[in-house]
A protein has these predicted regions:
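Generic detector of well-ordered alpha-helical segments enriched in charged/polar residues
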Residues: 84, 88, 126-134, 171-175, ...
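Phosphate/adenylate-binding glycine loop and adjacent helical scaffold
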Residues: 48-53, 73-82, 122, 126
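Hydrophobic, aromatic-lined core segments that form the binding pocket/scaffold
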Residues: 85-163
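Intrinsic-disorder-associated interaction segments
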Residues: 57, 79-80, 118-126, 219-224, ...
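Alpha-helical oligomerization segments
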Residues: 190-254
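An amphipathic, hydrophobic-aromatic interaction surface with interspersed Lys/Arg
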Residues: 1-58, 65, 127-215
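Extended, charge-biased low-complexity segments
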Residues: 57-96
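A generic structural signal for solvent-exposed, polar alpha-helical segments
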Residues: 18, 29, 69-72, 236
Length: 254
């Protein structure tokens, strides 16, 4: 079972109802939209895809040891570490605390360890913890490795699918949810990041479903495939890791 499957199995209710997750006595709360900028900035240190870094030693080492290596280098060169500060901020945001105690060290077996508010976390547990935080807050996060060339293809395919248009800035996304749901701005600002994006995605699917359905029923357009209801799980072309740009173009008749 992958970490993703394990997280969704063990914490399905917490993820669904935005409840805090208890991991080894550490309470992890879903981050609200009002703190999205700080969260995205601070969580950047736990979102690095180090497997794509062209260095065999980095690829082989655990994520926790990788962070410790960066922290040591920064302290040696600058006297302080931005990586350490961002890591601490990320934990404080997720745990909703104002102060935190973090100790990093290498044990007698050469393994990296983290003591977070008196809770000892080993290398495997840290990898699970960071992915738990990311799955709890980012609905489109996926820790599966993708071939770099295919990853580039998928990014291009995503642009094609969206007509080459950029997504509106965050302020406009908030306004869209206010208009589309009837919630006031304060309600939206208090939404967890995960729910904010899921609601936006469902609204978008509902709108397109209505347009396509009306066009089909009215005889304006004939679709090759039946129109899938917006609440049914749709197998997105981009979710298929073997989809290429050319395949997507053909499927979309571009």
């Amino acid at each position: 079972m992958s970490i993703k499957e394990e997280i969704y199995k063990n914490y399905y209710e917490e993820l669904t109802f935005d409840d805090p997750i208890d991991y080894k006595g550490l309470l992890l709360y879903p981050v609200s939209i009002r703190k999205i900028n700080k969260f995205l900035q601070s969580s950047s240190v736990i979102r690095i895809q180090k497997e794509y870094i062209p260095d065999k030693e980095i690829i082989k080492m655990s994520y926790l040891k990788f962070l410790m290596t960066n922290i040591d280098k920064e302290k040696e060169e600058y006297g302080e570490s931005l990586t350490f500060d961002l890591l601490a901020l990320c934990f404080m945001i997720c745990m909703r605390i104002e102060e935190i105690s973090i100790r990093l060290f290498i044990d007698e077996d050469g393994k990296a360890k983290l003591i977070l508010n008196d809770v000892e976390i080993d290398e495997n547990e840290f990898d699970y913890l960071r992915k738990l935080i990311l799955y709890q807050n980012l609905p489109n996060y996926d820790d599966e490795l993708i071939n770099p060339d295919l990853k580039n293809d998928l990014e291009q395919a995503d642009k094609i699918k969206n007509g080459g248009e950029e997504t509106e800035d965050f302020e406009h996304l908030i306004a869209n949810l206010v208009i589309g749901t009837g919630m006031n701005i304060d309600d939206v600002k208090n939404l967890p990041i995960r729910k904010f994006y899921i609601i936006g995605q469902v609204m978008d699917r509902k709108l397109h479903y209505s347009i396509y359905k009306q066009a089909s029923v009215g005889g304006f357009v004939e679709f090759k495939q039946p129109i899938t209801h917006y609440l049914k799980k749709n197998i997105d072309l981009l979710e298929n890791k073997v989809t290429t740009v050319e395949t997507l173009k053909n499927n979309l008749n571009i």
